[in-house]
């Protein structure tokens, strides 16, 4: 009976892990839109914190033509993405030093 109970518990844990992985993937692929200045600036970002698009209303940059405005939008998106990647790298380095002495199972990431 004890072995059967343990096997059932292990199976439930595996199912939960699979569901969590699926949910994490769905969240990572989700897109959200942030707006500021009465919708003059719009940012589309994924759940992975990747900026996909920045849109700046032409009235915000009145001296620029459409091509130049698009360049500014792309540069803002690239700068935000670079900052996010730096934060991720810093977090991994800090967590790595914190968990260096722990014998964590392969593939286990902190924080959960």
UniProtKB/Swiss-Prot annotation:
Subcellular location: Cytoplasm, Nucleoid
Pfam families assigned to the protein according to its UniProt record, in alphabetical order: YbaB_DNA_bd (PF02575)
SUPFAM superfamilies in UniProt: YbaB-like
Assigned protein family: Belongs to the YbaB/EbfC family.
DNA repair is among the record's keywords: no
Function: Binds to DNA and alters its conformation. May be involved in regulation of gene expression, nucleoid organization and DNA protection.
Keyword DNA-binding listed: yes
GO cellular component entries: bacterial nucleoid; cytosol
Entry keywords, A to Z: Cytoplasm, DNA-binding
Name by which UniProt lists this protein: Nucleoid-associated protein Pfl01_1806
Example GO molecular function: DNA binding
NCBIfam families per the UniProt record, alphabetical: DNA_YbaB_EbfC (TIGR00103)
Subunit structure: Homodimer.
């Amino acid at each position: 009976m004890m072995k059967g109970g343990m096997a059932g518990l292990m199976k439930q844990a595996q199912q939960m892990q699979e569901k969590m992985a699926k949910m994490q993937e769905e969240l990572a692929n989700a897109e959200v839109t942030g707006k500021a200045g009465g919708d003059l600036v719009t940012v589309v970002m994924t759940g992975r914190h990747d900026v996909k698009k920045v849109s700046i209303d032409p009235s915000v940059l009145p001296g620029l033509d459409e091509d130049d405005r698009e360049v500014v939008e792309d540069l803002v998106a690239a700068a935000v993405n670079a900052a996010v990647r730096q934060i991720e790298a810093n977090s991994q380095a800090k967590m790595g030093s914190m968990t260096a002495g722990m014998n964590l199972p392969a593939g286990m990431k902190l924080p959960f």
